[in-house]
Amino acid sequence: MAMQMQLEANADTSVEEESFGPQPISRLEQCGINANDVKKLEEAGFHTVEAVAYAPKKELISIKGISEAKADKILTEAAKLVPMGFTTATEFHQRRSEIIQITTGSKELDKLLQGGIETGSITEMFGEFRTGKTQICHTLAVTCQLPIDRGGGEGKAMYIDTEGTFRPERLLAVAERYGLSGSDVLDNVAYARGFNTDHQTQLLYQASAMMVESRYALLIVDSATALYRTDYSGRGELSARQMHLARFLRMLLRLADEFGVAVVITNQVVAQVDGAAMFAADPKKPIGGNIIAHASTTRLYLRKGRGETRICKIYDSPCLPEAEAMFAINADGVGDAKD
């Protein structure tokens, strides 16, 4: 009897272990989905059961060889494996309390963000040039590898660079500050240069496949909007640009939901030239319009302070109060400003 109870307990824990984290798409085969259909899904960029469950039906039907009936069956089976219904606010609150936050390297900045950069959501940083956007990204690429009790995420970092500003030397300097092996830190950062908006989107499909294979804690896109400013020009292409940008941001949000990674994107600003600019305290606004504003969970506005100091302001957040913090850009990454 005791032996039977032990076996049942072991079975329970194995079920719990399996349901924790993203589930490989091969699990759909155990639910009666044809292996060839699963292969077609994988070739189309779906690497987890969650990715399938979160996808709209028309996206599955657009895959060659997947009929409407097959799409219905696939979605039904995926929904059984992924909890997508209602839950109590108590349960959701419990899940929120388990969210990991990644340190920025500055105690003041972490205090402003109530712990650091939140995993499982999109954080947008925008500001002029030389305000510290890329420097925060470089620091985060190292701190996300730290143990959780040191403010890290115990995972690798993925860095999509669209402006050619990624510098491994900066990572080595930050690694030395935290007592980490420089070669290990560099090995744990997957880097890709984005050359156009279609390529930038294609890189997210590769990112999804890599996140299934290994544990990533952070995905950086620096900058998310730079290529959209060059690939699309004029008001005639504005609608196409915004649709493409919305798809890209939706994919980022899906990766944050699926894998629980912290997604950090940087954004540029544009000067307002309309009549309202005369009365605005700061006539600069982030580009991307409402689409990027709605996609980002937390928006941070960075501006220059005196010397090497920078000021970060909570521009928009569902739970953080509007406030400011000062930080500095040092030789070994982002840190606190000296009085």
From Swiss-Prot:
Transmembrane segments: none annotated. Residues 48-77 form the HhH domain. Residues 184-257 are annotated as: Interaction with PALB2. Gene3D superfamilies: 5' to 3' exonuclease, C-terminal subdomain, P-loop containing nucleotide triphosphate hydrolases. There is a cross-link at residues 58, 64 (Glycyl lysine isopeptide (Lys-Gly) (interchain with G-Cter in ubiquitin)). It is found in: Nucleus; Cytoplasm; Cytoplasm, Perinuclear region; Mitochondrion matrix. Keywords: Acetylation, ATP-binding, Chromosome, Cytoplasm, Cytoskeleton, DNA damage, DNA recombination, DNA repair, DNA-binding, Isopeptide bond, Mitochondrion, Nucleotide-binding, Nucleus, Phosphoprotein, Ubl conjugation. GO terms for molecular function: ATP binding; ATP hydrolysis activity; ATP-dependent activity, acting on DNA; ATP-dependent DNA damage sensor activity; chromatin binding; DNA polymerase binding; DNA strand exchange activity; double-stranded DNA binding. The modification Phosphoserine is found at residue 14. Belongs to the RecA family. RAD51 subfamily. Plays an important role in homologous strand exchange, a key step in DNA repair through homologous recombination (HR). Binds to single-stranded DNA in an ATP-dependent manner to form nucleoprotein filaments which are essential for the homology search and strand exchange. Catalyzes the recognition of homology and strand exchange between homologous DNA partners to form a joint molecule between a processed DNA break and the repair template. Recruited to resolve stalled replication forks during replication stress. This is DNA repair protein RAD51 homolog 1. It comes from Canis lupus familiaris (Dog).
